[in-house]
């Protein structure tokens, strides 16, 4: 193993009008409990607040984010229907975080995880020795309907000065056009095809056992999946269900994630999260 087990999260790029949510606390607490981290870093522009924040803050190194990173240009949202939809739904913070995570890991190395990650098992030390590690996600259909490989950026491990991350960051800055993932997941897959030796790819099960679709969200929040062998963490795809008004994937929403639901619930997320509340 090269380097320390440092974990990085990005949050609070927009003003925080609501208290820090239990889902986000679970991401940090499950990391603390399962990963034996040398440090957990939270990178934020606006510091979170609330009871769950007060409970986890002593275990974190908090870093303030300044100006938007190079390459993140909100003016590009106007160039496409998809980009305008991203801006309209307020998902621009996710794009800024796409650039920040690459800069953070390029400079310091370690592991990055989205703050809607629920850790299940310790990430092996060997993963930290690779130049860069990503997990595959379900393939994405191109304009011609042909499925193309995609590598999700919700969990990334990398060494400081990673060659792959440097190439990815350059590509992201060139290709960002306001659409959801051309600069991120799709760009990573393109670069992997060009230079497969620079990247260690894990099967989707490691980080993305349940996909960003109706069946995947049902398996996470309505059903019980005990077949978690080989699963290191669960990505919860929070943007697809967080708002109670969004029901195209599920009627589950953030307001339903409470200590009581975790204590008594039978769904996969409740069962995995339950020990962390103890």
Q: Where do the PLM segments sit?
A:
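Small-residue hinge/turn detector
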Residues: 98-110
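Glycosyltransferase-associated regions of secretory-pathway enzymes
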Residues: 1-97, 115-278
